[in-house]
Amino acid sequence: MRYRSDRVKIAIDVMGGDRAPDEILKGALLASKEVEGEIVLIGPEEIVRNKGLPFVSAFEIVKMDDPPLEVLRKKNSSMHVGLKLLSEGKVDAFVSAGATGPLFLGATSIVGKLEGIERPALGVAVPSLKGATVLIDAGANAKVRPEHLVDFAFMGIAYSKVLGAENPRVGLLNMGSEENKGPDDIKRAYQLLKEFLGDTFFGNIEGHDINLGTVDVVVADGFSGNVALKTMEGTAKLVTSVLKESIKDGGFLSLLGALLMKRSFDKMKEKLDPRSYGGTFILGVKGIVVKAHGSSDAKAIKHAIKVAEKGIRMNIVQEIERGISHVRNSGDGR
């Protein structure tokens, strides 16, 4: 796997997200201190100028409640301009906390789909006991055909290899581990994954397996994947909140113990904090597009930009192209 070591250029949609533009600008400034390259601000000139970072003016806004087609209609919006810059090779990646529908449509229409990919998908690396598990689709395609789930598996395998997995194993998210569980489309997807992936396919997995690291890649339709992701985010917040309350209510000894274990607690909190893995790749398009959570604060935006940088340096688009081409042409598991 080739690693890019040169300076990168990442564009950020300053007007995308519930907390735009203030938190987006703060996050971009934080990221600029850690990323080896340029962060390019895209938004209305009166908002993005004099921030100490390069900028591109875009006076229109794709709002969070806008229908998907608005990204194509509003050609002077920060989202459209950013995707256009990416498609023209003027930036290496584009990050937005804007609405998923417009961003996804814009990525597939303006940046374009990779050859052989009918449905791009959202892929996110979530924390697990064994490091990270790739969840795909995390919310782009509510309804899919079984064949689309096979494409998701190929893309997820490539992403998992970028994260360091040597021989990623794939699981199909279902309501039970038995082969005959689930609706007909899931049963059909099971058979296709078994046929195309061979021993790489682990079989059905359940929601609790995602964070246990039972497999390296979890394949799901966008509805189920998004529910799983949001549930994990809520659980992470619950765990940290309960831990804080327990320490607070436990008296002096609990506080003393917490002080002695502060470094361990901080590491746990960082790993569980959804903001720490705050970016989701739109996989299957010809450029690196990262979707940040709509409610992202500065910390989450910083991490989303760093996710984009990692995707650039690990050549994730080329790895997906190579992985899909190799698996499909080799005949392995067919």
UniProtKB/Swiss-Prot annotation:
Q: Does the keyword Ribosomal protein apply?
A: no
- Where is it localised? Cytoplasm
- What are the record's GO terms for cellular component? cytoplasm
For this chain, the annotated S-S bridges are none
Reactions listed under catalytic activity: a fatty acyl-[ACP] + phosphate = an acyl phosphate + holo-[ACP]
- Name any one Pfam family assigned in the record: FA_synthesis
Task: Write the record's keywords in alphabetical order, separated by commas.
Answer: Cytoplasm, Lipid biosynthesis, Lipid metabolism, Phospholipid biosynthesis, Phospholipid metabolism, Transferase
Superkingdom of origin: Bacteria
Q: Which family does it belong to?
A: Belongs to the PlsX family.
List the HAMAP family.
Answer: PlsX
Subunit structure of this entry?
Homodimer. Probably interacts with PlsY.
Q: What is this protein called?
A: Phosphate acyltransferase
- Species of origin reads Thermotoga petrophila (strain ATCC BAA-488 / DSM 13995 / JCM 10881 / RKU-1)
